[in-house]
Regions:
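Iron-sulfur-cluster electron-transfer modules
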Residues: 1-102, 108-123
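Short glycine-rich loop/turn motifs
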Residues: 34, 165-167, 229-230
Length: 249
């Protein structure tokens, strides 16, 4: 369809880490009957707050993007929030009411725990449906998308803007002032410091692209922001379990 083509041309992918093309996810095989589009707003990864900040600052963009996806899929929309972000529920519900989408989508609070945001957990928590081993959410009639992805779809349709920038969290005990930044995709992390964030002197012993549970350890800051980079975490020695190396024999 033209809508899926627009998403494809905008280069929109899953922004929660997997970077799976959004136009493919929104066009499942004909034998998959999609009943729900589930926006994974749990953000259970420690240190990361980029989705929370996005929902707080631009709730209208999330609701608009979800409405577009629902029109494409013909499904019902659910936004899943962890209950430590319960203050956002009335904010999003007000926007849903304002836009006239109360029959099309709702906001559900789920328990704050890790790994609440994983696909099978979030589907089970929201819908009471178990996804069998080896199966995908689409097999259970569900499409799961990330907050950033849904907002990027809104930008593509309303502004004609491709996915050329993203927001990410800079956090961890080694960061002087943890923050969320919006930067062009491809920006080197080393180019962001010290102008946009600074580290406590000689305190960062571990640099992670992403969060501490699902992220990847990096040797230094000479790597770029990708479409799936949700944050950069700088950990101190107290926050990591590092043991002294010794001879293995």
């Amino acid at each position: 369809t033209a809508a899926l083509d627009r998403i494809k041309q905008a280069g929109i992918v899953g922004m929660g880490g997997a970077s799976f093309p959004a136009h493919v996810k929104l066009n499942p095989p004909e034998d998959k009957d999609i009943e729900y589009v589930l926006v994974n707003a749990a953000e259970c990864e420690p240190y990361l707050t980029v989705d929370e900040r996005t929902m707080k600052e631009t709730p209208e963009k999330l609701i608009d993007g979800l409405a577009i996806v629902l029109k494409i899929s013909g499904a019902y929309g659910i936004i899943a929030l962890e209950d430590n972000k319960a203050y956002l529920k009335p904010v999003l519900e007000e926007q849903i009411l304002k836009c006239g989408y109360t029959d099309d989508m709702e906001v559900i609070l789920v328990k704050t725990k890790y790994p609440q945001g994983s696909e099978k957990f979030i589907v089970s928590s929201c819908l009471g449906v178990e996804i069998p081993s080896g199966k995908l959410p689409a097999d259970a009639g569900v499409i799961i998308s990330n907050v950033g992805t849904i907002c990027a779809i809104s930008d593509a349709f309303r502004l004609g803007k491709p996915l050329i920038e993203r927001s990410l969290t800079i956090s961890g005990g080694a960061v002087e002032t943890p923050c969320n930044l919006k930067v062009p995709v491809g920006t080197m992390i080393s180019d962001l410091s010290p102008e946009y964030f600074s580290l406590k002197e000689n305190s960062a012993v571990k640099i992670i692209s992403g969060g501490p549970m699902m992220g990847f350890a990096m040797p230094d800051m000479n790597f770029p922001v990708a479409k799936g980079t949700s944050g950069i975490t700088f950990l101190t020695k107290d926050e990591t379990y590092l043991v002294d190396e010794d001879q293995c024999i």
